[in-house]
Amino acid sequence: MNICVYCSSSDQVCDEFKQLAAEFGKWMAHEGHTLVYGGATGGLMSAVAEGVANAGGDIIGIIPDCIIEKGRKSDLPTELFVVGDMAERKSMMKEYSDVFVVFPGGFGTLDEMFDTISACMVGEHDKLTILFNPDNFWMGLLLQLDKILKSGLGYKFTRNGNLKVVDTLDGLKEEIIKNENE
Protein backbone atom coordinates (compact mmCIF):
# COMPACT_ATOMS: atom_id res chain seq x y z
CA MET A 1 0.00 0.00 0.00
CA ASN A 2 1.23 3.51 -0.79
CA ILE A 3 0.81 5.71 2.28
CA CYS A 4 1.06 9.46 1.81
CA VAL A 5 2.28 11.36 4.86
CA TYR A 6 1.59 15.08 5.11
CA CYS A 7 3.70 16.68 7.84
CA SER A 8 5.94 19.52 8.91
CA SER A 9 9.33 20.15 7.34
CA SER A 10 10.26 22.57 10.12
CA ASP A 11 13.27 21.65 12.23
CA GLN A 12 11.60 23.39 15.17
CA VAL A 13 9.12 20.52 15.62
CA CYS A 14 9.39 18.76 18.99
CA ASP A 15 11.45 15.60 19.44
CA GLU A 16 8.37 13.61 20.51
CA PHE A 17 6.72 14.15 17.12
CA LYS A 18 9.97 13.33 15.30
CA GLN A 19 10.21 10.06 17.23
CA LEU A 20 6.61 9.16 16.36
CA ALA A 21 7.25 9.91 12.67
CA ALA A 22 10.41 7.78 12.66
CA GLU A 23 8.62 4.90 14.39
CA PHE A 24 5.76 5.13 11.90
CA GLY A 25 8.21 5.09 8.99
CA LYS A 26 9.92 2.01 10.39
CA TRP A 27 6.55 0.26 10.81
CA MET A 28 5.57 1.16 7.23
CA ALA A 29 8.74 -0.42 5.85
CA HIS A 30 8.36 -3.55 7.97
CA GLU A 31 4.79 -3.96 6.72
CA GLY A 32 5.85 -3.57 3.09
CA HIS A 33 4.18 -0.18 2.59
CA THR A 34 5.68 2.57 0.45
CA LEU A 35 5.99 6.13 1.74
CA VAL A 36 4.71 8.88 -0.55
CA TYR A 37 5.77 12.32 0.66
CA GLY A 38 7.02 15.73 -0.38
CA GLY A 39 10.62 14.69 -0.99
CA ALA A 40 12.13 17.48 1.10
CA THR A 41 14.43 17.58 4.10
CA GLY A 42 13.71 18.78 7.61
CA GLY A 43 11.42 18.14 10.52
CA LEU A 44 8.94 15.30 10.36
CA MET A 45 9.53 14.85 6.63
CA SER A 46 13.10 13.77 7.33
CA ALA A 47 12.07 11.72 10.38
CA VAL A 48 9.46 9.61 8.59
CA ALA A 49 11.63 9.14 5.49
CA GLU A 50 14.64 8.14 7.61
CA GLY A 51 12.45 5.66 9.48
CA VAL A 52 11.42 4.05 6.20
CA ALA A 53 14.91 4.16 4.67
CA ASN A 54 16.66 2.76 7.76
CA ALA A 55 14.25 -0.19 7.72
CA GLY A 56 14.86 -0.86 4.01
CA GLY A 57 11.54 0.45 2.71
CA ASP A 58 10.59 2.22 -0.49
CA ILE A 59 10.03 5.97 -0.70
CA ILE A 60 8.37 8.03 -3.42
CA GLY A 61 9.28 11.70 -3.17
CA ILE A 62 7.40 14.38 -5.09
CA ILE A 63 9.11 17.75 -4.94
CA PRO A 64 8.59 21.04 -6.77
CA ASP A 65 11.46 22.97 -8.36
CA CYS A 66 11.07 25.85 -5.89
CA ILE A 67 11.98 23.60 -2.95
CA ILE A 68 14.95 22.08 -4.81
CA GLU A 69 16.19 25.63 -5.48
CA LYS A 70 16.23 26.19 -1.70
CA GLY A 71 18.55 23.21 -1.27
CA ARG A 72 15.92 21.11 0.51
CA LYS A 73 15.82 18.00 -1.76
CA SER A 74 16.15 14.75 0.16
CA ASP A 75 18.45 11.97 -1.03
CA LEU A 76 16.27 9.32 0.64
CA PRO A 77 13.56 8.66 -1.98
CA THR A 78 14.03 5.49 -3.99
CA GLU A 79 11.94 7.20 -6.68
CA LEU A 80 11.85 10.98 -7.03
CA PHE A 81 9.53 13.08 -9.18
CA VAL A 82 10.37 16.74 -9.79
CA VAL A 83 7.29 18.82 -10.56
CA GLY A 84 6.67 22.42 -11.56
CA ASP A 85 4.74 23.66 -8.55
CA MET A 86 2.91 22.79 -5.33
CA ALA A 87 -0.40 22.15 -7.12
CA GLU A 88 1.22 19.52 -9.33
CA ARG A 89 2.87 18.00 -6.26
CA LYS A 90 -0.47 17.64 -4.46
CA SER A 91 -2.09 16.17 -7.55
CA MET A 92 0.63 13.53 -7.93
CA MET A 93 0.57 12.71 -4.23
CA LYS A 94 -3.16 12.02 -4.46
CA GLU A 95 -2.66 9.92 -7.60
CA TYR A 96 0.13 7.76 -6.18
CA SER A 97 -1.38 7.19 -2.72
CA ASP A 98 -3.88 4.70 -1.32
CA VAL A 99 -4.34 6.38 2.06
CA PHE A 100 -3.34 9.75 3.55
CA VAL A 101 -1.91 10.34 7.02
CA VAL A 102 -1.71 13.86 8.43
CA PHE A 103 0.97 14.32 11.09
CA PRO A 104 1.42 17.62 12.96
CA GLY A 105 2.36 20.44 10.65
CA GLY A 106 1.69 24.00 9.64
CA PHE A 107 0.06 25.77 6.72
CA GLY A 108 1.53 23.50 4.05
CA THR A 109 0.29 20.41 5.87
CA LEU A 110 -3.17 21.94 6.26
CA ASP A 111 -3.21 22.90 2.58
CA GLU A 112 -2.38 19.33 1.56
CA MET A 113 -4.96 17.85 3.92
CA PHE A 114 -7.79 20.17 2.88
CA ASP A 115 -6.97 19.69 -0.80
CA THR A 116 -7.22 15.92 -0.29
CA ILE A 117 -10.47 16.21 1.68
CA SER A 118 -12.01 18.56 -0.90
CA ALA A 119 -11.03 16.23 -3.75
CA CYS A 120 -12.77 13.39 -1.93
CA MET A 121 -15.89 15.47 -1.38
CA VAL A 122 -16.28 16.19 -5.10
CA GLY A 123 -15.63 12.58 -6.09
CA GLU A 124 -12.05 12.73 -7.41
CA HIS A 125 -11.18 9.85 -5.08
CA ASP A 126 -12.66 7.88 -2.18
CA LYS A 127 -9.48 7.30 -0.19
CA LEU A 128 -9.14 7.47 3.57
CA THR A 129 -7.55 10.46 5.32
CA ILE A 130 -6.32 9.87 8.87
CA LEU A 131 -5.64 12.90 11.05
CA PHE A 132 -2.98 11.89 13.60
CA ASN A 133 -3.54 13.92 16.77
CA PRO A 134 -0.69 13.21 19.23
CA ASP A 135 -0.76 15.33 22.39
CA ASN A 136 -4.01 16.90 21.10
CA PHE A 137 -2.02 18.86 18.52
CA TRP A 138 -5.05 19.30 16.25
CA MET A 139 -7.65 19.97 19.01
CA GLY A 140 -8.51 23.50 17.84
CA LEU A 141 -8.90 22.30 14.26
CA LEU A 142 -11.01 19.35 15.38
CA LEU A 143 -13.40 21.68 17.19
CA GLN A 144 -13.82 23.71 13.99
CA LEU A 145 -14.23 20.57 11.86
CA ASP A 146 -16.90 19.35 14.27
CA LYS A 147 -18.73 22.65 13.88
CA ILE A 148 -18.54 22.35 10.07
CA LEU A 149 -19.84 18.78 10.16
CA LYS A 150 -22.66 19.56 12.61
CA SER A 151 -23.81 22.32 10.28
CA GLY A 152 -24.05 19.78 7.45
CA LEU A 153 -21.30 21.35 5.37
CA GLY A 154 -19.03 18.29 5.31
CA TYR A 155 -21.67 15.59 5.06
CA LYS A 156 -20.58 14.05 1.74
CA PHE A 157 -17.06 13.51 2.99
CA THR A 158 -17.76 11.98 6.38
CA ARG A 159 -20.80 9.97 5.31
CA ASN A 160 -18.51 7.38 3.77
CA GLY A 161 -16.13 7.43 6.73
CA ASN A 162 -13.28 8.95 4.72
CA LEU A 163 -11.93 10.97 7.66
CA LYS A 164 -10.64 9.31 10.81
CA VAL A 165 -8.95 10.90 13.82
CA VAL A 166 -6.52 8.93 15.97
CA ASP A 167 -4.49 9.99 18.99
CA THR A 168 -1.91 7.19 19.19
CA LEU A 169 0.53 5.48 16.88
CA ASP A 170 -1.17 2.15 17.60
CA GLY A 171 -4.51 3.68 16.62
CA LEU A 172 -2.97 4.97 13.40
CA LYS A 173 -1.60 1.55 12.51
CA GLU A 174 -4.97 -0.08 13.28
CA GLU A 175 -6.83 2.30 10.93
CA ILE A 176 -4.37 1.57 8.12
CA ILE A 177 -4.69 -2.18 8.63
CA LYS A 178 -8.50 -1.91 8.63
CA ASN A 179 -8.39 0.16 5.44
CA GLU A 180 -6.04 -2.33 3.80
CA ASN A 181 -8.37 -5.23 4.62
CA GLU A 182 -11.49 -3.55 3.20
Model-based region annotation:
Residues M1-Y96, D135-N181:
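A cross-family phosphate/adenosyl-ligand binding-site feature
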Residues E88-E124, I130, E182:
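Active-site/ligand-binding-proximal alpha/beta "capping" segment
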Residues H125-D126, R159:
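A generic structural signal for well-ordered coil/turn residues at beta-strand boundaries
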Residues T129-D135:
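Short, glycine/charged-rich beta-strand-loop motifs at protein surfaces that mediate ligand recognition
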